[in-house]
């Protein structure tokens, strides 16, 4: 009910860089955002600081890190009985985050325009059409290094998550991760980014054009008796 960010807070879902997708409920969170913003965060793995998190509703309050311990002690000592009392205590310590750290301040409009499409191919084309916008150029460069398969399943995931409960989205993630371990780029992504750290993953397929709809849809198939039970 209360998510407090500080100037040290960083939010990112960078899983497409290792052949995965926004997991641990991340797809659900991104699916509730405006479509262009959610897709941008899922595909690019952009890093957001406190100002943007509060603006998007991913955080409910901002408290400077030097006040966090005081806030914690006040919450413990006052033993608030309901959310309203919790909010009142947090508001005592809250302040405004630094807008200068915002990525969305100058780029929200173009992000929504470029990333609101329902296919990765259309998003790539939209990036090209937006050039020479420097911000979009950086996002496009990031996209070209991600797993093509991960890009496609991540976009399908967050579009579907928009109309799902958290429970159903987690079941979907469970299906996806089983397939990532069996037929995806996950092991190669971990090797390239975390083990050998050569940052040169050999994605298979290596282009978005080679990742057809049948391959994408296979990641979302029911596991029948092996499906996650929640």
What do these predicted regions represent?
Residues 4-109:
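Conserved catalytic cores of soluble enzyme domains
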Residues 65-230:
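Intrinsically disordered, low-complexity segments enriched in small/flexible residues
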